Regions:
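Active-site-adjacent structural elements that line small-molecule/cofactor binding pockets in enzymes
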Residues: 1-292
Length: 292
């Protein structure tokens, strides 16, 4: 479930996460933007309007700090980013932050990453918008190098180091799992080369069978070319918040081969209708589809 409600209220976030966990949801996902813009020229790729559905004054805490709060409030539910704008972060520091989170959560972290779509945000950070894909690839390689046991070395276009040690290491074998987001050939190839999961997203029209059939071969062929098992790359897709629509969409996602379906939360408060809405969602969607 995507976490987008009342994110500035730590008590709500903790209680909401505990409720979602108790109902058997598999994972909670945080979102990421360093800043939002009241006006922008960049085009949001997942709506025909080109506008993001998030209001510019939305409360959007840092996703890693938010996951630390979630890790302390829960015991079993998986925690991830959907999506962390990877090239906007420093990969050496991020590797340490994620390894620490994985330790403190006892191995429950998944890092979902994308290259970002808001050019204005990238320029605010004094970064190059045009090379964000190349930087994303290198940032992944840097983090994986630092998560290896022992002494690390890396030689790339942006980072070079040798004889360094970054501890603690992630709890999970092979490092924090990577979920690669995007809807392009480049994103699909990135998932095949580096990803544990691929998360194409078409919120304008829901899961797109034709687009997925076009993209998925890039995942599997790239994985095979890199000496990886193509079947080891999992597929995550998106549904909606309405229970009836979500069940139909989730069933369609499963037919497409999805290993996970991320849903949007129903609206409401913990003191009002939200607990009942989530419980209804569990009975009408999770249980019929094989959830707890």
């Amino acid at each position: 479930m995507l976490l987008i409600l009342n994110l500035a209220d730590p008590d709500f976030v903790a209680r909401y996460a505990q409720l979602v966990e108790s109902l058997g949801f598999e994972s909670l996902w945080t979102i990421d933007h360093a800043v939002m813009h009241a006006t922008y020229d960049s085009r949001y790729p997942y709506k025909t309007t080109g506008r993001t559905p998030l209001p510019p004054d939305s409360n959007m805490p840092d996703p890693l700090i938010l996951m630390a709060l979630l890790a302390g409030a829960t015991e079993r539910i998986r925690l991830g980013t959907s999506m962390l704008i990877l090239p906007q972060r420093h990969p050496i520091i991020l590797a340490k932050e994620l390894a620490t989170l994985d330790q403190y959560s006892k191995g429950r972290i998944t890092l979902g990453v994308g290259v970002g779509w808001v050019k204005e945000e990238v320029l605010d950070l004094k970064q190059n918008f045009g090379d964000r894909g190349r930087r994303t690839n290198e940032w992944i390689e840097v983090m994986k190098a630092l998560w290896d046991e022992g002494v690390s070395a890396y030689q790339g276009d942006y980072f070079q180091f040798e004889g360094v040690i970054s501890n603690p290491k992630p709890v999970q074998e092979g490092g924090v799992p990577l979920m690669i987001g995007g809807h392009s050939e480049a994103a699909a190839k990135r998932a095949g080369r580096y990803g544990d999961e691929f998360y194409p997203h078409w919120s304008t029209r829901g899961p797109d069978k034709e687009a997925l059939e076009t993209l998925w071969p890039f995942v599997t062929e790239t994985a095979a070319a890199c000496g990886r098992d193509p079947d080891a790359v999992k597929l995550t897709l998106t549904s909606t918040s309405d229970a009836k629509t979500s069940r139909e969409t989730a069933e369609f996602c499963r037919e497409l081969g999805a290993d996970r379906v991320v849903v949007l939360p129903p609206k409401g408060t913990l003191e009002g209708s939200l607990p009942d809405e989530l419980a209804r969602f569990r009975e009408e969607v999770l249980v019929p589809l094989g959830g707890e």
